[in-house]
Amino acid sequence: MDYCSKPEEVAQNPLAFRLMVLISNDNEAAFDFIWRCWNFFHLLDDLIDRDKPVTIQEASRELFLFTQTIALNPFFQQNKFSLLPMILNACNGWVVGEEASEANKQYAPVLKCSDFNIYSHVAFLVGGWEHMRYVDSKFRTYDKE
């Protein structure tokens, strides 16, 4: 079972799967890439924040599946020169959010959610500007926390 398919994850993010389907615009390889990112990033966040238990099996499985996706997914391979910098930016945003000073803690959740930019970029790659804008209007407001 994917990390974000667990009942507690679905309860926390009930629209996530459907949003990934919307973003991917019927491109199966694009869906596989963003769904794998979503799972891996959420698992990693839970490991770092230690707010939810993560088993070694879950961590190992998601690491392998993410690595396999980066190595073999045709959508990623076709777009790796634009997607890899987006992943780098998301990783950096996460660190900046975690290191935010007390005066700037209000911005931490926004910085830590830089992976949204990856999903927005994928929407552009599979459907162009209008699709990206439509997806952003749905995705950027799905989680009010």
Q: What kind of region is each of these model predictions?
A:
Residues 1-145:
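All-alpha prenyltransferase/terpene-synthase fold signal
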